[in-house]
UniProtKB/Swiss-Prot annotation:
Pfam families: Anticodon_3, GST_C, GST_N_5, tRNA-synt_1g, WHEP-TRS. A motif ('KMSKS' region) lies at residues 593-597. Changing Y344C: In ILLD; when assayed in yeast, induces a slight growth retardation and reduction in methionine incorporation; may interfere with efficient substrate binding. This is Methionine--tRNA ligase, cytoplasmic. The gene is MARS1. It comes from Homo sapiens. The lineage of its organism: Eukaryota, Metazoa, Chordata, Craniata, Vertebrata. Residues 74-198 form the GST C-terminal domain. Enzyme activity is increased by spermidine, EEF1A1, and when the Mg(2+) concentration is increased from 5 mM to 13 mM (in vitro), possibly by promoting the dissociation of the complex between the enzyme and its product.
């Protein structure tokens, strides 16, 4: 058969990606033709893509061609896939065609483009989130995924048009985009020109009618409540009524924590931070804070959990720092290890072990793995040309030399890796190299070194990845980085250095050398555990019983997904390898980068001097966690999130619920007689709680935080609509209703305190103390919403949880930490000219929007006159527009009315 495609024709993307399905089952010849070539003789207009079958017949519908390839591969049709294909043709394509036309032909940007397709993108995101599966039709990729990916790729390959808040869509799109057939399809059709490659094709298309891009009504945006079945409501009520008796007994505490047969044993690591660096906020969110959230969640689930980290203390970075400070390398390690430990303690990081790599156990385990690799023929010897500084009389390994990156031209690349493009570098490849210590130009000299024979281990690695990746929770960027290295072919990697500070090489002729830090740094996880317990092998040589989660920033991925697995596989000693590799993108500071030397950005040892509590830092860093793409810390945004999400939403609800118990019922939880509306609220809270669990089990940490805030908003609306402060003054029935509303609200507050524990442990403990939540309910989180504060339960003294951040305070901190280059919020890429209002004006507008939104909800709940509701809705829309302008954002196109 023969497949005809053309450059710059969007329909060719999915068919080329789907053609990979037919490999090995049929011979497919791919021919590139011009878009005006008539391939199908009986069509009146030129058409591509076209599949000419061996029978001589033609298929010229994109979905039909894709379906044919999938059927050839043995794929079986299903109703859900067919539904997605119908939706793609009738709903997505018209909206997407309009968006691409506006972008490429008319040169529009931002919401003018995204507005026409936003509803469709949101539908995909909600569907993926609701079913909690990686693909549209379930756990495995289907025809629907390829067809929709191909349709969306020209637009979404630009991150500006992939909304960050649609995280499920983001993850799905990244997963597919990193697959080799999809990458080849994109290269063939777009020719590295991006969406502009479609210009000639789109210019020949008719201008879309307004209806194709329209999503306009006068209804304000509201959160969409899922439709509940009677069974879901009944199950929620049953779980609620069982209360505390549903809780299982607490797991007994172990010391040391060791794997237990028959239980889920979760081993969690954070990438080991270089000891000589004080971590900034980006380092903290990328490794330790993200892992801490998951470790705390694992303990709430009663999983047998061990969480470890430590300082990476060997290597050139330590020697360089020692020279700078006039100390020995060991003195540098001792000094900065304490600094790291103090920072993580202040941030409430709940390590079971925080160790270090300068230990006898590190030497013993590293040398043992090396000897096993050497014995099995996986170590090579070779002569290496190295840079040597004649002035300092030393070889310039790794961080002792800087120069221009040979790949991307970055002027401060190190001798081992470029921080900008992430590529590994041999020091002699640097352009314009300089000694980091004296800044003189080095000379090239030869030296004998040892190499890990990665090409010889590549097949084992690919087989292991083939077993591990399906069904795992590797982040898309981790998969992409790993696959890109394998696609280029692994090369032998030098594992020794001409240094004094490191793990000695136990081989004759190499006594004056040490192991390269990234050969032995990942072995640090094992040695840190060995210093914790002499039974460390029960964790690290037990892949059948241990689930290993490793957290890091994306620049550390190759060493965890390639170098250490190859070392462990080559040693053939049944080592536990990573099951789930969780990598973040980068966190920037305002509109620049963190820089200790320039005094730009907040570093860990400075955060505690700001007067802002550790839990507020934790909340904001997790709220902006760079999961799918780089994100940026913003002082203005920190103020807004604290004052809106924490103070006005979460804190307001929990404080009101507790205060009503104290003020109206003497501090005792009142009797609750649930109405059908109350029972529906139980079911909605239960669904959101289950969504929270689904997200955290998939390590979607930022998204799960949104579930907490959503439940809090439900609670605020519930109180606002039912007005217990008024009902308590009314009839007996009114007072009973006030009691029910108050009792249910304070139980929601109790649930939120437990859900908050992984994110804000101090705030969580404060809420639980105020409510005097029974101890078992503080330490276990089930998937159902339980009544943990029954009628008659006495609560403690209730007080506000959060303090308002003031504009003067934030502006002072901005100036102090070098944020002067970003006195206004970073401008969205889609806006050409904006004027940002002062934070106090923004806050005032946010308060007005909240107040007006409550008025609208109350009127709707009371089924008020339509004209009265419409008038208040108009006020709300106007306030939202004012707020968008004040924040420097384009006012969003109003969304269509949602079906109830």
């Amino acid at each position: 058969m023969r497949l005809f495609v053309s450059d710059g024709v969007p329909g060719c993307l999915p068919v080329l990606a789907a053609a990979g399905r037919a490999r090995g089952r049929a011979e497919v010849l791919i021919s590139t033709v011009g878009p005006e070539d008539c391939v199908v003789p009986f069509l009146t207009r030129p058409k591509v893509p076209v599949l000419q079958l061996d029978s001589g017949n033609y298929l010229f519908s994109t979905s039909a061609i894709c379906r044919y390839f999938f059927l050839l591969s043995g794929w079986e049709q299903d109703d859900l896939t067919n539904q997605w294909l119908e939706w793609e043709a009738t709903e997505l394509q018209p909206a997407l065609s309009a968006a691409l036309y506006y972008l490429v032909v008319q040169g529009k940007k931002g919401e003018d483009v995204l507005g026409s397709v936003r509803r469709a993108l949101t539908h995909i995101d909600h569907s993926l989130s609701r079913q909690n599966c990686p693909f549209l039709a379930g756990e495995t990729e289907s025809l629907a995924d390829i067809v929709l990916w191909g349709a969306l790729y020209p637009l979404l390959q630009d991150p500006a048009y992939l909304p960050e808040e649609l995280s499920a869509l983001h993850s799905w799109f990244q997963t597919l985009s990193t697959q080799e057939p999809c990458q080849r399809a994109a290269e063939t059709v777009l020719k590295q020109q991006g969406v502009l490659a479609l210009r000639p094709y789109l210019q020949k298309q008719p201008q879309p009618s307004p209806a194709e891009g329209r999503a306009v009504t006068n209804e304000p945006e509201e959160e969409e409540l899922a439709t509940l079945s009677e069974e879901e409501i009944a199950m929620a009520v049953t779980a609620w009524e069982k209360g505390l008796e549903s809780l299982p007994p607490l797991r007994p505490q172990q010391n040391p924590v060791l794997p237990v047969a028959g239980e889920r044993n979760v081993l969690i690591t954070s990438a080991l931070p270089y000891v000589n660096n004080v971590p900034h906020l980006g380092n903290i969110i990328g490794c330790v804070l993200s892992a801490d959230v998951f470790a705390r969640y694992s303990r709430l689930r009663q999983w047998n959990t061990l969480y470890l980290c430590g300082t990476d203390e060997y290597g050139t970075a330590t020697e360089t720092k020692a020279l700078e400070e006039g100390l020995t390398p060991q003195e540098i390690c001792d000094k900065y290890h304490i600094i790291h430990a103090d920072i993580y303690r202040w941030f409430n990081i709940s390590f079971d072990i925080f160790g270090r790599t300068t230990t006898p156990q590190q030497t013993k385990i590293t040398q043992d793995i090396f000897q096993q690799l050497l014995k099995r023929g996986f170590v090579l010897q070779d002569t290496v040309e190295q840079l040597r500084c004649e002035h300092c009389a030393r070889f310039l390994a790794d961080r002792f030399v800087e120069g221009v990156c040979p790949f991307c031209g970055y002027e401060e690349a190190r001798g081992d890796q470029c921080d900008k493009c992430g590529k590994l570098i041999n020091a002699v490849e640097l352009k314009k190299p300089q000694c980091k210590v004296c800044r003189s130009c080095p000379v090239v000299q030869s030296s004998q070194h040892l190499f890990l024979d990665l090409p010889k281990l590549e097949k084992r690695l690919e087989e292991w990845l083939g077993r591990t990746l399906p069904g795992s929770d590797w982040t898309p960027n981790a998969q992409f980085i790993t696959r890109s290295w394998l696609r280029d072919g692994l090369k032998p990697r030098c594992i020794t250095r001409d240094l004094k500070w490191g793990t000695p090489v136990p081989l004759e002729g190499f006594e004056d050398k040490v192991f390269y830090v990234w050969f032995d740094a990942t072995i640090g996880y094992l040695s840190i555990t060995a210093n914790y317990t002499d039974q460390w092998e029960r964790w690290w040589k037990n892949p059948e019983q241990v689930d290993l989660y490793q957290f890091m920033a994306k620049d550390n991925v190759p060493f965890h997904s390639l170098v250490f697995p190859c070392s462990a596989l080559g040693a053939e000693d049944n080592y536990t390898l990573v099951s789930h590799l969780i990598a973040t993108e980068y966190l920037n500071y305002e509109d620049g980068k963190f820089s200790k030397s320039r005094g730009v950005g907040v570093f860990g040892d400075m955060a505690q001097d700001t007067g802002i509590p550790a839990d507020i830092w934790r909340f904001y860093l997790l709220y902006i966690r760079p999961e799918g793409q780089d994100s940026a810390f913003s002082w203005t945004d920190l103020l807004l999130k604290n004052n809106s999400e924490l103070l006005n939403n979460l804190g307001n609800f929990i404080n009101r619920a507790g205060m009503f118990v104290s003020k109206f019922f003497g501090g005792y939880v009142p009797e609750m007689v649930l109405t059908p509306d109350d029972q529906r609220l139980l079911a909605h809270v239960t669904l959101e709680l289950q969504h929270y669990h689904q997200l955290l089990e998939k390590v979607r940490i930022r998204d799960a935080l949104r579930s907490i805030l959503t439940i809090s908003r439900h609670g605020n609306q519930y109180i606002q609509v039912n007005e217990p402060w008024k009902r308590i003054k009314g009839s007996e029935a009114d007072r009973q209703r006030a009691g029910t509303v108050t009792g249910l609200a304070v139980n929601i507050a109790a649930l939120l305190s437990v859900m908050l524990q992984p994110y804000m442990p101090t705030v969580s403990a404060t809420i639980q103390a105020q409510l005097q939540l029974p101890p078992p309910a503080c330490s276990i989180l089930l998937t159902n919403f339980l009544c943990t504060l029954p009628a008659g339960h006495q609560i403690g003294t209730v007080s506000p949880l959060f303090q308002k951040l003031e504009n003067d305070q934030i502006e002072s901190l901005r100036q102090r930490f070098g944020g002067g280059q970003a006195k206004t919020s970073p401008k969205p890429a889609v806006v050409e000219t904006v004027t940002t209002a002062k934070p106090q004006q923004i806050q005032a507008l946010m308060d007005e929007v909240t107040k007006q939104g409550n008025i609208v909800r109350e009127l709707k709940a009371q089924k008020a006159d339509k004209n009265e509701v419409a008038a208040e809705v108009a006020k709300l829309l106007d306030l939202k527009k004012q707020l968008a302008v004040a924040e420097g954002k384009p006012p969003e196109a109003p969304k269509g009315k949602k079906k109830k």
